[in-house]
């Protein structure tokens, strides 16, 4: 029962065995329909299964003593649960690793027409399942073995569930129908239990139904242990599988806890925990290894993933950094310091405090518990303010990095030192909180100081569950984004081409965008639930508030600056699933209306409303796709696709001058070309109005408010109408789709958005011989160097001398390398300029000779005789 990509197990689906035999998979039915639908024929095994299930009712009727009933059904449930997790687990394990079930069937000649009792029984059973027209000999032995294995699964799984339900019933009616006895519990509590339990059961039912609709019988019965379905190479994450990892084993068991709540029985709760625990063992040792073997990465991919994890450690002196006390190393000074600190605040101080009744503060005696509480609050407030302020200063002003560089410490060292500081402060807060509660345990909990005194075992169970959830979530986060992400590496290390250009959507981030927002502090909630005192409640509120502020107002803002709105605000799996099931389909399908001439194209590419913008392609990608089509769009269509018609009747206007128009009616300009924008505003407009230049792919999510910085690509609106030329540092120096935005009153509220336009590279053809070097040099100078460097000299002027006069040497070299690579189709690195044999003597003319030589070498290697510029166009 796994998240397997499968079309269906109906006629027409193609199957292939592990030995290479292909076949058409016939129709099969799910467990419930097979057993309980009177319209579906019953096999001999299925009739036996129904009799065994009915026998549970006979056990209930024959045993009059309810205590004996409970003990009997506990024994039966344990038997069937062990049969499931260890019996079926063993069969699947030997089948996965050795194809043992198929070998047994082949050795016993189960499906041979030899007249033996075994073969006749097997044939009758399969034909009673599949119909008399089913020919056992025409199908692979693997598929027939799977059909018989399904009956074993049906027997064990249905018996497991039936005995559990019988146990729920006998526990619920115990002690004079305790689950609804108003003499034992108040009516409002009974009603709350029944409603909550029913909700959990219905949710569990939805999970099971949705899971089966997604994975079908093939994966429900572990079909890929026996054969594969063709075009079924990847796991699928859809429906409930997009909400939580392994839903059949995680939230697929919440119904068990719902039954425990309804029955008001700790016996049922204990049995549910026992069954769920065994199921997780089954997942870890049987299910996951097979998933990794069948759907996991290849050997090379696994090696690459391991190398990436090792490279993640280069910022931490190539040793896993300390997270809490995880990765502790005796020979690392910071680890020893953390160990002493954690031990002191968690155990030593609370123990010493428990030895005294009061602590003298001046003339007043103060309870040690009060001092520990104040200490915990002070430490948490200090950690919250210091970490948050440092992250803000680092995000906007690079304060942390600048200090290290000013002291001749490399950038790579900043993240390692930050990780030590961050982990020490976090460990200090948790140690002080633990110490506060440890002190109260040592002196004995006073019931009058607790909000809740009842349901002790339930509180302990839920509290421990929340603590383990936080530990699991934190480990999943580190596994997904590495230590670099855990310690806010994006704040400290500049993003390079080697780093990921997109935020990860693997692991726990497939289901939640910010899993740490709630689950990152649920351990504190768990401790508060176990010891529900006012002190713990205040601490819990403080933890949750700080976590919310740090993630939503500091981390998210920085991620938007680095990766853009579109990347940060993608819907998580849970959000997608809730939208799919809660938002009416008519709203989801509503698209902008387009012209009749382009209706097919617009229906395919048009953006949805702003609410659903997260599920659409960017205008940037759309225009790139448009280049490969023969469809012509009008400027009106382009404006409509970009959602700029929102401002059609605005009193504010922006018009971009001197743009080129392609045959697809797209407005373009060459990288580095000055761009003049004219504005028109009402007479009473604010003198603080301003115009900024943005990349559309980073502003897709908000057409009325700009959420990212203009990075100094802006100008003040000084009059009711006028124009301004964006050039040099005011421009973007990379290809893409861009737009100008008119903002109001010095803020980021948008009054008008210009038509989108594309920045492209000029087409410069590199000649095949040095005879054309002068022409190439002049073209490079005119289309690249004159635009990138103000006042550039001749083609024989040293490039380095001109670059030295620019604002940023490295940035200028990177721009030159990028534009030349895009324009010529020959990739060069900034190292061409930085590591030249004699930087002072490198000229545009000599650079053109280098390009011609590179082109010649590439042509010789590829035996190609077409111009590189033509190849570039095709790309």
Swiss-Prot record:
Isomerase keyword on record: no
Subcellular location: Endoplasmic reticulum membrane
First-level EC class: transferase
Superkingdom to which the source organism belongs: Eukaryota
Membrane topology category: Multi-pass membrane protein
Protein name: Phosphatidylethanolamine N-methyltransferase
Family as reported in the entry's similarity comment: Belongs to the class VI-like SAM-binding methyltransferase superfamily. CHO2 family.
Metabolic or biological pathway, per its Swiss-Prot or TrEMBL entry: Phospholipid metabolism; phosphatidylcholine biosynthesis
Catalytic activity, reaction form: a 1,2-diacyl-sn-glycero-3-phosphoethanolamine + S-adenosyl-L-methionine = a 1,2-diacyl-sn-glycero-3-phospho-N-methylethanolamine + S-adenosyl-L-homocysteine + H(+)
GO terms (BP aspect): methylation; phosphatidylcholine biosynthetic process
Keywords assigned by UniProt, alphabetized: Endoplasmic reticulum, Lipid biosynthesis, Lipid metabolism, Membrane, Methyltransferase, Phospholipid biosynthesis, Phospholipid metabolism, S-adenosyl-L-methionine, Transferase, Transmembrane, Transmembrane helix
Any one GO CC term of the record: endoplasmic reticulum membrane
Function: Catalyzes the first step of the methylation pathway of phosphatidylcholine biosynthesis, the SAM-dependent methylation of phosphatidylethanolamine (PE) to phosphatidylmonomethylethanolamine (PMME).
Residues in compartment: Lumenal: 1-42, 93-152, 208-242, 287-338, 392-424, 481-517
A family per Pfam: PEMT
Organism: Debaryomyces hansenii (strain ATCC 36239 / CBS 767 / BCRC 21394 / JCM 1990 / NBRC 0083 / IGC 2968) (Yeast)
Topological region Cytoplasmic: 64-71, 174-186, 264-265, 360-370, 446-459, 539-875
UniProt GO molecular function: phosphatidylethanolamine N-methyltransferase activity
InterPro entries, sorted: Phopholipid_MeTrfase, Phosphatid-EA_MeTrfase_fun, SKICH
Gene: CHO2
UniProt KW Nucleotide-binding keyword: no
């Amino acid at each position: 029962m796994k998240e397997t990509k499968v079309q269906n197990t109906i006629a027409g689906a193609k199957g292939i065995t592990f030995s290479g035999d292909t076949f058409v998979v016939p129709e099969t039915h799910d467990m419930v329909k097979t057993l309980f639908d009177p319209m579906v024929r019953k096999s001999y095994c299925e009739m036996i299964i129904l009799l065994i299930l009915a026998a549970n009712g006979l056990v209930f009727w024959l045993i009059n003593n309810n205590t004996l009933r409970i003990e009997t059904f506990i024994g039966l449930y344990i038997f069937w649960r062990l049969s499931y997790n260890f019996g079926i687990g063993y069969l699947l394990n030997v089948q996965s690793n050795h194809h043992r079930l198929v070998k047994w069937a082949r050795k016993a000649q189960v499906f041979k027409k030899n007249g033996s009792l075994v073969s006749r029984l097997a044939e009758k059973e399969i034909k009673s399942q599949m119909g008399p027209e089913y020919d056992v000999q025409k199908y692979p032995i693997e598929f027939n073995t799977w059909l018989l294995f399904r009956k074993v699964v049906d027997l064990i799984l249905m018996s497991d569930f039936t005995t559990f339900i019988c146990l729920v019933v006998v526990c619920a009616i115990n002690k004079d129908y305790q689950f609804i006895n108003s003499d034992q519990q108040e009516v409002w509590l009974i009603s709350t239990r029944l409603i909550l339990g029913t909700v959990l059961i219905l949710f569990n039912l939805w999970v099971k139904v949705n899971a089966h609709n997604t994975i079908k019988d093939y994966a429900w019965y572990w079909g890929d242990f026996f054969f594969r379905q063709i075009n079924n190479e990847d796991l699928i994450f859809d429906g409930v599988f997009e909400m939580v990892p392994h839903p059949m084993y995680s939230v697929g068991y919440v119904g068990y806890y719902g039954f425990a709540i309804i029955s008001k029985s700790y016996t049922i709760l204990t049995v549910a925990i026992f069954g769920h625990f065994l199921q997780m063992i089954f997942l870890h040792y049987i299910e996951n290894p097979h998933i990794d073997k069948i759907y996991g990465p290849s050997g090379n991919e696994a090696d690459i993933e391991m190398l990436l994890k090792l490279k993640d450690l280069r910022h931490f002196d190539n040793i896993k950094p300390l997270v809490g006390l995880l990765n502790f190393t005796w020979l690392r000074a910071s680890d020893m310091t953390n160990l002493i600190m954690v031990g002191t605040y968690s155990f030593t101080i609370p123990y010493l405090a428990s030895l005294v009744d009061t602590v003298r503060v001046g003339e007043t005696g103060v309870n040690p518990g009060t001092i520990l509480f104040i200490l915990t609050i002070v430490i948490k407030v200090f950690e919250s303010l210091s970490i948050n302020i440092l992250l803000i200063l680092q995000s906007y002003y690079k304060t942390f990095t600048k200090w290290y560089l000013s002291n001749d410490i490399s950038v790579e060292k900043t993240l390692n030192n930050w990780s030590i500081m961050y982990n020490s402060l976090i460990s200090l807060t948790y140690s002080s909180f633990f110490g506060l509660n440890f002190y109260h345990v040592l002196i004995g909990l006073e019931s009058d100081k607790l909000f809740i005194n009842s349901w002790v075992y339930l509180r302990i169970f839920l509290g421990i569950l929340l603590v383990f959830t936080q530990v699991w979530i934190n480990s999943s986060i580190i596994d997904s984004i590495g230590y670099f992400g855990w310690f806010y590496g994006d704040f400290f290390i500049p993003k390079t081409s080697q780093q990921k250009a997109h935020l990860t959507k693997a692991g726990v981030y497939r289901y939640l965008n910010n899993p740490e927002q709630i689950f990152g502090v649920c351990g504190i909630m768990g401790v508060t639930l176990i010891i529900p005192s006012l002190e713990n409640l205040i601490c819990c509120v403080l933890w949750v508030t700080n976590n919310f502020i740090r993630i939503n107002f500091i981390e998210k803002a920085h991620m938007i600056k680095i990766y853009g709105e579109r990347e940060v605000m993608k819907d998580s799996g849970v959000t997608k699933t809730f939208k799919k099931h809660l938002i009416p389909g008519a709203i989801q399908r509503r698209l902008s209306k387009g012209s009749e001439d382009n209706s097919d194209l617009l229906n395919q590419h048009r953006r949805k409303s702003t609410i659903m913008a997260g599920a659409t392609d960017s205008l940037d990608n759309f225009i790139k796709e448009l280049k490969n089509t023969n469809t012509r769009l009008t400027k009106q269509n382009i404006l409509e696709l970009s959602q700029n018609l929102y401002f059609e009747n605005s009193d504010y206007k922006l018009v971009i001058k001197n743009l080129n128009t392609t045959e697809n009616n797209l407005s373009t300009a060459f990288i580095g070309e000055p761009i003049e924008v004219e504005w028109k505003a009402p007479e009473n407009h604010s003198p603080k109005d301003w115009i900024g230049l943005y990349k559309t792919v980073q502003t897709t999510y908000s057409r009325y408010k700009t959420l990212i910085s203009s990075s100094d690509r802006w100008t003040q609106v000084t009059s009711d109408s006028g124009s301004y030329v964006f050039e040099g540092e005011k421009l973007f120096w990379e290809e893409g789709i861009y737009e100008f935005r008119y903002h109001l009153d010095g803020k980021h509220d948008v009054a008008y958005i210009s038509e989108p336009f594309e920045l492209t590279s000029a087409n410069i053809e590199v000649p095949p011989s040095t005879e054309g070097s002068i022409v190439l040099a002049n073209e490079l100078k005119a289309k690249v160097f004159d635009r990138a460097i103000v006042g550039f000299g001749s083609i024989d002027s040293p490039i380095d001398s001109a670059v030295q006069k620019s604002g940023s040497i490295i940035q200028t070299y990177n721009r030159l390398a990028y534009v030349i690579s895009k324009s010529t189709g020959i990739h060069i690195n900034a190292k061409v300029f930085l590591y030249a044999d004699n930087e002072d003597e490198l000229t545009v003319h000599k650079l053109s000779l280098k390009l011609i030589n590179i082109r010649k070498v590439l042509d010789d290697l590829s035996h190609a005789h077409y111009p590189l510029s033509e190849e570039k166009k095709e790309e």
